[in-house]
C-alpha cells in the first residue's frame, strides 16, 4: 500500500497469489483510498471459509458434495462422521484450497494420522488448522466456470475450463472447452456459477470450481475469489481480455458485453511450467538458477513468464516459472500445436515439468479424454532418471534429450523429443515418498532442498516399510517421506523447522532381521 501511495496509483491489482483473496488487504486498500481490483471483502470473507461457503451454496440451491457444514474439532469426531458419510472421504482445510491441507482417507484406521497431517499443513499454509470433511467423489473431473460480475447487477459466465490433470491436487495442464462438457451441461453449470456469485453479492472476476462425476453429475467445490492462473485459455477461446474487464468493473463501469454476446471459438491448452523434477512421477521441487530460457514462438502460441536467464527460483515461494498456452481451431490441432511448442521450449539450470507434460499430451488416455483428477498419479508412469542422454538429469527442462516418441493425434503422427512413458499403472505408493529416498540400509534422505515441518517418529519406534517418518516442505509443497524398510528407528537427525539439503540424511532405520524362512 505504501508503494502504491508513493507511485501515485489509484488502484491495486493483486494478481493471483498471496493477497489476491485476502479480505483484510482489500479493506486496507479501501481505507487507504485505493481501489482494490477484485471482489468486495465481504464476498471474499464469505467464500474464504469453505464451511461458510458450503452453507451459503446449499441454501441457494447449488449442489454440494455431501459432507460437514462445520469444522471438525477432533480426529475421533472426524472418524465417526466419516463412518456416517461412508469411506473414502476427504479431509480439507476450512480456510484454504489448492490442495493444501487436504488428505484422502480410505480406511478408519488412517483418520487420525491424516487429520493431524492435514491440520498441521492447513495451519502452516493458511494460519488456521480447522478441517471439514466431504465424501470423496471417485475419479472425478475438475471443471471450473469463469464468471464476471459488475456493480450494475450483471453477472455472466464465460464457459468452462478442464483442470483434471493434477499432481498433489495442484493443476498441471488445463484446457478449454472441456472434452467432457456439451452445450447443455455447459449451460447448467454456468447457471449454477452465476447463482453462486449472486448468493454472496460477488463482483469482478472469479471462478466457480466444480467436480464432475462419471455419471455427469456436478458439485460445487469452491469459488476462487480472484483471477485464476489459467485465465489465458478462457481469453483465447472467447477473445475477451479478462484483466481489462476487471479494471473496467473496478472503475464502476458495466461489463463491455452481455451473456448473449459471449462467443466461444476453437480450443486452448495451457501447461504450467514449474521448477520440478518429474522423474519417477515424484515432481520434486527444484530451486536453482535459470541459466537459459527461450520460450517457443509462432501463431497461436503464448508465453506468460515470470523469469529470464539469470533469475533465481527460490525454495520459499511457488515454483511456477511460466505458462505456455496455445490456441487452435479444434482440440486435435491444439494438442499438436502444444506438442510442438513443448518440444521447442528451452530452459536450462533447473529441471522442469516439461517432460511430464510431453508424456501427458501424448498418452492415449489424454488424447481420448479419458482422464480424471487421479489419472496422472494412478495411470501415468514416468521413467526414473537413467543418466543416459544429454537431457536426463542435466537441468535441461526443454524438449531436447536425444530421445523421441511417435505420437498419433487425430490420425496424424508427430515425433516428440521426450523421455519414455509407460501406459500402465505405476507401482502402488509411487507418489507417497515424493521428497525422499529410503536406501536398503534404512537411511531416509531428502531429494530436495526444503524445510522439515514434522517428524513423525522417535528413536526406538518400530516402523513398517512405507510408513511416513517425517515431512518436508519446499516451494509451498509438503511431502511425507517414508521408510523403505521395516525396522526400528535408530536415529532422527532433524527437527521441525530445520532446513535440509538435497541428499541429506534425515532418519536412520535399523532394518528388521530376516526370519528363518526369508529368502536370501
Which residue ranges define each predicted feature?
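N-terminal beta-alpha lobe that positions the nucleotide/phosphoryl donor
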Residues: 1-208, 212-228
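Structured functional modules or segments
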Residues: 434-520
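Short beta-strand-to-loop capping motifs
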Residues: 106-107, 326-328, 511
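Short beta-strand micro-motifs enriched in acidic
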Residues: 148-150, 211-213, 293, 306-308, ...
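Short amphipathic alpha-helical segments
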Residues: 100, 177, 318-324, 440-442
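Catalytic cores of soluble metabolic enzymes centered on carboxylation/carboxyl-transfer
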Residues: 193, 232-435, 501-504, 516-520
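ATP/adenylate-binding site constellation spanning eukaryotic-like Ser/Thr protein kinases
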Residues: 152, 226, 239, 318, ...
Amino acid at each position: 500500500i505504501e508503494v502504491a501511495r508513493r507511485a501515485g496509483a489509484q488502484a491495486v491489482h493483486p494478481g493471483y497469489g498471496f493477497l489476491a483473496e485476502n479480505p483484510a488487504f482489500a479493506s486496507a486498500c479501501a481505507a487507504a483510498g485505493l481501489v482494490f481490483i477484485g471482489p468486495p471483502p465481504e464476498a471474499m470473507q464469505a467464500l474464504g471459509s469453505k464451511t461458510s461457503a458450503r452453507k451459503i451454496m446449499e441454501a441457494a440451491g447449488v449442489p454440494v458434495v455431501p459432507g460437514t457444514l462445520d469444522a471438525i474439532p477432533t480426529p475421533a469426531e472426524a472418524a465417526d462422521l466419516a463412518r456416517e458419510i461412508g469411506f473414502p472421504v476427504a479431509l480439507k482445510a476450512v480456510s484454504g484450497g489448492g490442495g493444501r491441507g487436504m488428505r484422502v482417507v480410505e480406511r478408519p484406521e488412517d483418520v487420525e494420522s491424516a487429520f493431524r497431517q492435514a491440520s498441521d499443513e492447513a495451519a502452516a499454509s493458511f494460519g488456521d488448522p480447522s478441517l471439514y470433511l466431504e465424501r470423496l467423489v471417485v475419479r472425478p473431473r475438475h471443471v471450473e466456470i469463469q464468471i464476471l460480475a459488475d456493480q450494475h447487477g450483471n453477472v455472466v459466465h464465460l464457459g468452462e475450463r478442464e483442470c483434471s490433470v493434477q499432481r498433489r491436487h495442484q493443476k498441471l495442464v488445463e484446457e478449454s472447452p472441456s472434452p467432457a462438457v456439451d452445450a447443455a451441461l455447459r449451460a447448467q453449470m454456468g447457471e449454477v456459477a452465476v447463482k453462486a456469485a449472486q448468493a454472496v453479492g460477488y463482483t469482478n472476476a472469479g471462478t466457480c470450481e466444480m467436480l464432475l462425476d462419471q455419471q455427469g453429475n456436478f458439485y460445487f467445490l469452491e469459488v476462487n475469489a480472484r483471477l485464476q492462473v489459467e485465465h489465458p485459455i478462457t481469453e483465447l477461446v472467447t477473445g475477451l481480455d479478462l484483466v481489462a474487464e476487471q479494471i473496467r468493473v473496478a472503475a464502476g463501469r458495466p461489463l463491455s458485453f452481455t451473456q448473449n454476446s459471449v462467443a466461444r471459438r476453437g480450443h486452448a491448452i495451457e501447461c504450467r511450467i514449474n521448477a520440478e523434477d518429474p522423474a519417477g512421477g515424484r515432481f520434486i521441487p527444484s530451486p536453482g538458477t535459470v541459466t537459459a530460457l527461450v520460450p517457443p514462438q509462432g501463431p497461436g502460441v503464448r508465453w506468460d513468464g515470470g523469469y529470464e536467464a539469470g533469475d533465481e527460483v527460490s525454495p520459499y515461494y511457488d515454483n511456477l516459472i511460466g505458462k505456455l498456452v496455445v490456441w487452435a481451431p479444434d482440440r486435435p490441432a491444439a494438442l499438436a500445436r502444444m506438442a510442438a511448442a513443448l518440444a521447442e521450449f528451452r530452459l536450462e539450470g533447473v529441471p522442469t515439468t516439461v517432460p511430464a507434460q510431453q508424456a501427458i499430451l501424448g498418452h492415449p488416455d489424454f488424447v481420448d479424454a479419458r482422464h480424471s483428477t487421479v489419472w496422472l498419479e494412478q495411470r501415468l508412469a514416468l521413467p526414473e532418471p537413467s543418466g543416459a542422454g544429454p537431457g536426463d538429469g542435466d537441468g535441461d527442462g526443454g524438449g531436447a534429450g536425444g530421445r523421441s516418441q511417435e505420437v498419433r493425434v487425430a490420425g496424424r503422427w508427430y515425433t516428440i523429443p521426450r523421455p519414455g512413458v509407460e501406459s500402465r499403472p505405476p507401482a502402488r505408493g509411487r507418489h507417497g515418498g515424493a521428497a525422499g529416498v529410503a536406501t536398503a540400509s534404512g537411511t531416509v534422505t531428502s531429494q530436495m532442498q526444503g524445510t522439515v515441518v514434522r517428524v513423525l517418529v522417535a528413536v526406538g519406534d518400530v516402523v513398517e516399510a512405507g510408513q511416513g517418518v517425517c515431512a518436508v516442505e519446499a516451494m509451498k509443497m509438503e511431502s511425507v517421506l517414508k521408510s523403505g524398510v521395516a525396522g526400528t528407528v535408530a536415529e532422527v537427525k532433524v527437527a521441525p523447522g530445520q532446513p535440509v539439503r538435497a541428499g541429506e540424511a534425515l532418519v536412520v532405520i535399523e532394518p528388521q532381521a530376516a526370519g528363518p524362512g526369508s529368502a536370501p
